[in-house]
Amino acid sequence: MEVLMAERANLVFHNKAIDGTAMKRLISRLIEHFGMAYTSHILDQVKTLGFQQATATSISLGIDDLLTIPSKGWLVQDAEQQSLILEKHHHYGNVHAVEKLRQSIEIWYATSEYLRQEMNPNFRMTDPFNPVHIMSFSGARGNASQVHQLVGMRGLMSDPQGQMIDLPIQSNLREGLSLTEYIISCYGARKGVVDTAVRTSDAGYLTRRLVEVVQHIVVRRTDCGTARGISVSPRNGIMPERIFSQTLIGRVLADDIYMGSRCIATRNQAIGIGLVNRFITFRAQPISIRTPFTCRSTSWICRLCYGRSPTHGDLVELGEAVGIIAGQSIGEPGTQLTLRTFHTGGVFTGGTAEHVRAPSNGKIKFNEDLVHPTRTRHGHPAFLCSIDLYVTIESEDILHNVNIPPKSLLLVQNDQYVESEQVIAEIRAGISTLNFKEKVRKHIYSDSDGEMHWSTDVYHAPEFTYGNVHLLPKTSHLWILLGGPCRSSLVYLSIHKDQDQMNAHSLSGKRRYTSNLSVTNDQARQKLFSSDFYGQKEDRIPDYSDLNRIICTGQYNLVYSPILHGNSDLLSKRRRNKFIIPLHSIQELENELMPCSGISIEIPVNGIFRRNSILAYFDDPRYRRKSSGIIKYGTIETHSVIKKEDLIEYRGVKEFRPKYQMKVDRFFFIPEEVHILPGSSSIMVRNNSIVGVDTQITLNLRSRVGGLVRVERKKKRIELKIFSGDIHFPGETDKISRHTGVLIPPGTGKRNSKEYKKVKNWIYVQRITPSKKRFFVLVRPVVTYEITDGINLGTLFPPDPLQERDNVQLRIVNYILYGNGKPIRGISDTSIQLVRTCLVLNWNQDKKSSSCEEARASFVEIRTNGLIRHFLRINLVKSPISYIGKRNDPSGSGLLSDNGSDCTNINPFSAIYSYPKAKIQQSLNQPQGTIHTLLNRNKECQSLIILSAANCSRMEPFKDVKYHSVIKESIKKDPLIPIRNSLGPLGTCLPIENFYSSYHLITHNQILVTKYLQLDNLKQTFQVIKLKYYLMDENGKIFNPDPCRNIILNPVNLNWSFLHHNYCAETSKIISLGQFICENVCIAENGPPLKSGQFILVQVDSIVIRSAKPYLATPGATVHGHYGETLNQGNTLVTFIYEKSISDDITQGLPKVEQVLEVRSIDSISMNLEKRVESWNKCIPRILGIPWGFLIGAELTIAQSRISLVNKIQQVYRSQGVQIHNRHIEIIVRQITSKVLISEDGMSNVFSPGELIGLLRAERMGRALEEAICYRVVLLGITRASLNTQSFISEASFQETARVLAKAALRGRIDWLKGLKENVVLGGVIPVGTGFKGLVHPSKQHNNIPLETKKTNLFEGEMRDILFHHRKLFDSCLSKKFHDIPEQSFIGFNDS
């Protein structure tokens, strides 16, 4: 029997390895030839054979079988190299964070993929019978990517949100993962424990909703008689053959198919494999097939529109519940997919672009007007072409033309030489397709503390007009200038020009105090707590006990941001030869006027500081008393520091005050009330009497405290003191009473015959003898002050990167202003400062040359885009400089302009020095502490940054500077005046030797230059003096000419330019103060690469740069924070918004299917669809007029959206290798899209506006009533669709039972019990299955009606088909229509 059958089918002898696909083909052919039963019998034998063979070969898998790929090492190394270069570019500010992320992901993805491709050949060559190899390529469950993870590299993973982690897992599972890699792979999709559980339930719920939508769809008829179909065409090559054949097999043709005049397939014929192959070979015209979309029935489906049953390969039987099958076949892979095999990390499967490569070597030419420059996704420069671009490549003997489609990126420049197969252009992937894209925000955080600048204008974001969020209009850099904030009210310096008078309008606000800083040796974390300075009594004194820790080491620098209250006038007093710029301010709190602390900067008139001079001082409000009293030191060693200039004026009373430098931490103040009265005044109290508070003492004085009165009469005045305190009459046993003027620490017993007390605070005991026999002891309260020792700020400056030996240091020193036991007298209610905190300037002494005796201070202004920064520079000056010439400028101000500009004139400019070259090198010292104030835009809150050497880097670009020895003869009397007069107030010339110790910016006002220089005059002057001059203009540009170059003043742009006699092209680079420069930019021809930063100091042979970190930002990014604002580490700088294609991994896939099916508008995905539907809805009725418009508009909209929905869902499943037949998805999509929303335009009598009804029902009602019903198509999600069925019982059993039932009762709805669920709920017979035919009673009427409808509908369907398929015809119809229809008919339609 078997032999006969085999002969009859003449089976082909196969001698090939059979994998999964071959097996599928074999089975389908067996079924075709022999039917189901016989096939299953054959397959059993195949199974047994397989098991026998497997047992015989006994394949086992051991860890030794996992062979790693030899090329892995250098591949990974190569990728690491690439990402290192990328990191560098990011550091230099060439690439921003998003581009860096994208590029690093692509680098690693490519590496991982390449390794995966290497794997198979490697196995095949080394060990073809390796069990791993056999298993992975057997076509059974499991694929290459799993093996790839075992022997290749694990690759990139995605985090729980589906974002890529840009740190790849470089090891494979054979080598074992490191701890970090292990943790990362715990995240990965579906491998995590969390993931599996959650996703399964999601898939289950999806199935439930799907079934709910389509449960009533059953095959009820053989043919619905539709003439429509959907055309599928193999010709245009869009659809791969595999998908094409999958789409066709099992369908039914809707039209005859002709090859020329010969009909090769007829209407209603089922398509099998043979027919499909014939179509593919003949490349016939588009094939029209019937789908569930075209079926004419509302609540069921016919056999021909559904096609073959997937189970047994024949047309589907009547009574088959195809709806439920469809719902389950879509939902079920969801449950599998969650638990499916690993994936490569959900990498952008849609993101890679196609490349255009050069056909041969040669030079490339294209029209540059058609392209404009842009950046690629990875931050590389490229050209974007907006229209088709023809690129010619000229090789030696031949011209190649390459056509580049629009919207592509050209990666080469014009006239560039390209090699064969080099990538010259990148075609953007799938702009037209509806790609799954989502908008992602990425925040960039600051890496270090500093001050923010940016290099272009920014817009305010419209929603935050007054906020600190700005939009960038073009690509630019953001700069963070280093210098960390350490806010404290300890010291704060205001820096202004000398002898200026100005108002400081200052911001009021809470002060912040620094408390208990925990300092680790290298880094300090500050805990700042904000306390109200004048709050309750306990908080009145902020805690400075840890002062010595405020100055942190390492990368932290001091910033003082004081807060001044109200207006304070700044008046600098001149004291001997120093200028003091005091800052006092009045604070109004609870209507009390309390003087607030001020900081004054002291700068000598000539700007020269000696060693240990005081740069600034700060009067701490805690050491300020209003009452008089006596200061007592405990066990304090002090050094009297007396300087002549410390003569302090208090409202006309002069007082000479020495200073005592403190070594120990506490002193005591004993308060007393003192009145100094003229000798003639009458006193109303007696000596040694005891008075209460507010007792009248003289005619116009009352006592402020109660206590003992002492009256002393001096020559011309009377001193009246009131001591507060307890009076104690001692017994004879009391030892304390022997002493007078003793301080008693707390805790000592005070013994008395009657009482025994502990003393809580320090007290001061004073013995008073009013008469010879009696005496008593006055116990007076004492105010204790704790002082921390002065700290050395040397730790602020780490080992010096600028290779300078002399470091300027700032120390904080506390001085007590009064000696031990000195009485302190307050003069007419002024407050008395007991301790002054000073910043003392010092510098290291070199053992070899302790020559550096003085430092010069100068002010520098640096402008950055209109924001002015003042720097106080302190430079060391070597002393053995012999001053020869005197000032030979009669005006006494060197080369300064005559108009009294506000430059700080610190040193005699035209002094001529003479010393050998080596000394010059030494004397060009860097400022080690450059102090820098911050001013807001509105010049309000001032604060101070000290830039240490760690924040600056030094570069010496001017290597070729020649030093000229000064010729002492031939100095004319006033050689420089002609230059100054001819320059006008524009610039100054500085002699080069002196340039390091002072330079500054000239006035910022606009000046018209009228006089031109007489070149010969100038030349002569230069040659006579033989000095090298620098010229600066108002922009702060600095030029460095050769001594014998000519100077030409260009009055147009007010810049100096220097030219050789022979106008040689060699000009020195121009560096302006305040300019930003990126790392890796060379300034000098052979100069070393710089660190990124801002120039704050330009010298003869070197530049000092304040380090800064550039961040690149692209247009559309939002910048947080204000220009010039001080930021802390970790603050948000920029937010990028970029589009990324969602990784096509099934963990994201399921939600994606769900989003499409639910038509959610949260996401940009379905937004596209919704928008499309809207636009189709609007434009078609506008073109066609009302009744036709709605009919055709709805039809077209529905057809379009249906097709795109199906394609989308299939895309997700196919990307996971899941095969689902289109018709299942079609059945569900048909249910989602078959409803229309009645609109209010034409009020119909049948439906109320806003009602959801089926499209076919609306059309039928319109035909029956012969009036236009206005409606528009809506996309319902599956949940809404299942709540909008015809059966309320089915709805109620799904969700919201009470609401649905109540509504149905109120409306009086009728349930016709057509679906399965209603019948199941009520326990009836369900209308499906093979016995279904018996339920439908054939009747005469029933037979007649379909024929008539069939005819009319055929015509109508054809009409629709014409309109639907032939767009050209359609357009011409429209235009004709427009001409034909008169306006009245339009109005008529509107009325109806």
From Swiss-Prot:
Entry binding sites for Zn(2+): 224, 295, 302, 305
Keyword Nucleotidyltransferase tagged: yes
Cofactor comment: Binds 1 Zn(2+) ion per subunit.
Single GO BP term: DNA-templated transcription
GO cellular component terms listed in the entry, alphabetical order: chloroplast; DNA-directed RNA polymerase complex; mitochondrion
CDD domains cross-referenced by the UniProt entry: RNAP_beta'_C (cd02655)
Co-factor(s): Zn(2+)
Enzyme Commission identifier(s): 2.7.7.6
Hydrolase in keyword set: no
Reaction catalyzed: RNA(n) + a ribonucleoside 5'-triphosphate = RNA(n+1) + diphosphate
GO molecular function: DNA binding; DNA-directed RNA polymerase activity; zinc ion binding
Pfam families the UniProt entry points to: RNA_pol_Rpb1_4 (PF05000), RNA_pol_Rpb1_5 (PF04998)
UniProt main location, coarse: plastid
Domain of life according to the entry: Eukaryota
NCBIfam families assigned to the protein according to its UniProt record, in alphabetical order: rpoC2_cyan (TIGR02388)
Function of the protein: DNA-dependent RNA polymerase catalyzes the transcription of DNA into RNA using the four ribonucleoside triphosphates as substrates.
Family: Belongs to the RNA polymerase beta' chain family. RpoC2 subfamily.
Protein name listed in UniProt: DNA-directed RNA polymerase subunit beta''
Species annotation: Solanum tuberosum (Potato)
Phylogenetic classification of the source organism: Eukaryota, Viridiplantae, Streptophyta, Embryophyta, Tracheophyta
